[in-house]
Amino acid sequence: MDPERFGPKRAALTFDKDSGVAATAMSLADRSATHAARAGSMRAGWLRGSPDPRVEVVWRSGPYRVTELFFCPDEKTGRLVRRISLARSAAGASKVRLSTGVRERSIETEVAFRGRAAGPVIIEYRLVKQGVRSAVAVRLGTDPGGKNAAAAYWKDTAECRFSDPSLDRFFAAAKFQLRAAVSASGRLDGSIWQYNLEWVRDQAFIAMALAMSGQPGPARTILARLLRDFVSDEGATLDSSRLRPWEESELDQNGVLLFALESYLDWTGDLDLIRANWAKIEKAAAFPLRPQFRNVPSGLIVNRREFWERHEAHGIRMGMELAHQLFVIMGLRSAARLAGRLGRTGEAQDWTEAVMLLRKAMLKDKRFSLIDAGAFIKRRGIDGSVQREVRPDPGSSLPRQAPLFGPGRHLLDPDTSAALPIAWEFVDPAGRLAARTLASLEKLWDQDWKGGGYGRYNVTSEPDSPGPWPFASLFVARAALEAGDASKARRVLDWLGRVPGSRAASWFEFYGPRPVPPYPQVGIIPWTWAELIFLFVHHMLGVRPGESFLSVRPKLLPGIDHMTADLPLRDGRLELDVRRARRGQLPGFTCGSRKMPYHRYGLGLELPEKLERIAVRAIIP
């Protein structure tokens, strides 16, 4: 694909409208037959232990064993290398003809065996311009070797090991693929091959994950572009690559962007990005506080578009959405701290006061709080009544085979967005509110399907197909781990390891039948990779940097007794070694010559102005 131009699968530059990608297949011709990969004879996967992203494909045909290695050796140019090595069962001298190509362009070369091995043969694919459009050029090349520009880039990124091959692969693949999904200019499709559109929310979370995984460059590019191009002069944010009328504004996006900016700053120390873009940051913070967005009796934020983008046609009424209150409050809290770091005390005070009032109304208001029967609820109307169900517009173009149009009531709760205040510790994860909320979300596991996974919300109000959602399931996994239920987090990861796409660690938006049309076919969601990075770095390793303070609060999953990490942090590195205490072993933390007893709130360290390397050893229950 051209990274600067979104498109469906059929827009791939290697795709031919008649033959698909058949021309890219490789064949070997000897004196007796032509050999090629066949279904069932091929194994593909990430190359285990490689410091940079490499995919290995191994297949057999006749006497030949073929190993193909795919990788990108450059950071600044669009170049893919395909390294082909051949082996055979018999020794001796002989030759084969190797053929492959791209669309109408073919390549052939003669390969000589000396003994049982031959090669490697290097095929090089380059992204080139043909007028205003892009194309792929293919040629025979030379081996770039192991010390290339891309390898140097990946050497400086985060390294994490969890004593579990699946989780090690998930982390590495999430780190690799987040970078691959972002173009040089910062463009990023919300769902690869599916939507061909961009969202501030998704990209801000992805920028956070890039910073956590030691990739500040692309994180900065994304955030700078969002502030420049995706925040209007009034402070509204774009979703689906467009601005909407005020009633449809996805106000949580303003908060997520501000929250991501503070997280990026805490990880990188890059205050210049904040200073240079303060005018847009100020507008993004002020926008949700405009009078038209406020419920007069409570002060809470109102609109007619919910977190998952259902709106009036789906039966959503004007009201207060849980996730919108959450992220506006979290974002304003971040904006206030950013203002304080720039010496803008007036704005810091104003936004802090707004945070306190909104938080009090969200959690404590007897009529308007987003809590009912001791658990978080999704939505209230402007009169304070809980919006428990929806009735879709009978004249809408929504697909009639969806559960939303089935018989019976169409309920909004439970909704996995209710896990987010727990996952981000907006409320006490060990408290009764968190426990009751998480218990209510268990209705979404296997609600109308078999095999596991959480649906994004009550399936009876689903305008799409019933089925589990990977990134929504990770909301619950993160919240459960913070609440002390590590088995629920493990269950989600085990489920991700079973579903299609797990080998590549590239998951679809959801798993279920799709009404196509009117909806596009499902694609691969980059946000899922960000959620995995959050689970691994923020929750399991428990690394939470602040302005001048570092908190380390590690948590081990069932079946994992040891994990290590080497994480870039500002101008230095954080080295972390976490082990489960053996019988009779006293839990605690060691940092240099300091030894501290274990506490469930973890270890707190003051960050030096010039950070080089911090090494922490943790023995935890």
How would you describe each model-predicted region?
Residues 169, 173, 201, 205, ...:
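Generic recognition of stable, solvent-exposed alpha-helical segments in well-folded globular domains
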Residues 152-275, 320, 413-426, 453-483, ...:
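Substrate-binding groove/exosite segments of carbohydrate-active enzymes
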Residues 160-168, 210-223, 264-282, 293-296, ...:
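Structural helix-adjacent loops and short alpha-helical linkers that scaffold large soluble proteins
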Residues 344-386, 429-575, 579-583:
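Non-catalytic carbohydrate-binding regions of carbohydrate-active enzymes
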Residues 109, 240-246, 311-314, 318, ...:
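Short beta-alpha connecting loops at secondary-structure transitions
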Residues 1-166, 482-485, 525, 542-621:
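Terminal accessory carbohydrate-recognition/targeting modules of carbohydrate-active enzymes
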Residues 118-139, 190-192, 238-239, 244-255, ...:
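The feature captures the catalytic groove of carbohydrate-active enzymes
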Residues 176-187, 226-235, 258, 299-309, ...:
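Active-site-adjacent bridging/hinge elements
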